[in-house]
A protein has these predicted regions:
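Alpha/beta-hydrolase superfamily serine-hydrolase fold, recognizing
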Residues: 1-290
Length: 290
């Protein structure tokens, strides 16, 4: 299968489901720089919009810092419904782990990152890394499609950026807005989750409080200080629930910054990227010493 390329990235197939192929935009470090590890970037878009190109601002800079970044396309609303997207994230992690071995990255472990709804999906996938796969799943590996017996989506850490970690609570907040933003968030939420019950089921706080999870990955949450999209209370509730469950939850707030501020560039965007690289470096350094 022919790859699409530029000077900075290559677009590759990584997943096939029922003859539908999904692509990853792979950002690689400069040839003179050793690859530290492979990251999977899950795009946002209120579970329905955007694609693998959305996070290019930080994906490119992460590559320059030594990380191979696999920015993925995946099934999302309105064509597909929960939990298809998080299941695809697990498949992407499985693929990225194979890639890390193939390119001989310094670390063979994979960390997921995600912006907005992509952060929610990355967290949900990380907490359910062995979700039941579907018949007909194929992974692109060694220049051919293969059908793995099982998918391992486990990761040691997740970076979630201004993520709506409780879809039901965010849906109720969107209802209260009575404006174009609120209507878009409500429409997209229903398009992907179909019901408020499914939104509640997908709450990260509910998962860590009510379900038995094999592993609680470390979380770094980047919070926009002036987020009109995700209320701070939703994030605070997860922070409390995650720590109560025994997980490590780190949060960095960017005062005055709006939802998705990194995409606009500027000083706050650059600080966010520096913070992200520092956190990733610390994660992989700690993993290598254990």
């Amino acid at each position: 299968m022919e790859a699409m390329m530029s000077d900075d990235y290559v677009d590759l197939p990584y997943l096939k489901r029922q003859d539908e192929t999904y692509f990853v935009r792979l950002w690689s470090p400069p040839k003179s720089v050793e690859t530290k590890a492979v990251l999977v970037d899950v795009h946002g878009g209120a579970w329905c919009d955007h694609d693998r190109k959305a996070g290019y601002i930080y994906d490119k800079q992460l590559a320059q810092a030594g990380y191979a970044v696999a920015a993925i396309d995946f099934r999302c609303g309105p064509a597909f419904q929960h939990p298809t997207a998080s299941i695809d994230v697990n498949a992407a992690v499985h693929w990225a782990r194979l890639l890390a071995r193939h390119i001989q990255a310094r670390s063979q472990e994979v960390v997921t990152i995600g912006s907005s709804s992509g952060g929610h999906l990355a967290l949900l996938a990380a907490l359910t890394p062995y979700a039941e796969e579907e018949h007909g799943t194929e992974i692109w590996a060694k220049d051919e499609w293969t059908s793995p017996q099982s998918i391992d989506g486990s990761v040691p850490a997740v970076g979630a950026f201004w993520a709506p970690v409780d879809p039901a609570a965010r849906f109720m907040y969107a209802k209260s807005l009575d404006n174009q933003l609120g209507r878009r968030l409500m429409t997209n939420s229903i398009a992907y989750f179909e019901s408020e019950e499914a939104m509640r089921e997908a709450s990260i706080s509910r998962v860590v409080s009510e379900e038995t999870t094999a592993r609680l990955p470390r979380i770094w949450f980047a919070q926009a200080g002036n987020d009109q999209n995700v209320p701070a209370e939703i994030v605070q509730n997860l922070e409390q629930a995650y720590r109560t469950a025994g997980g490590v939850f780190e949060i960095t707030t960017y005062p005055g910054s709006p939802h998705g501020f990194v995409h606009a560039g500027g000083e706050a965007s650059q600080k966010f990227i520096r913070d992200l690289v520092s956190w990733l470096d610390a994660i992989f350094e700690a993993r290598s010493s254990t």
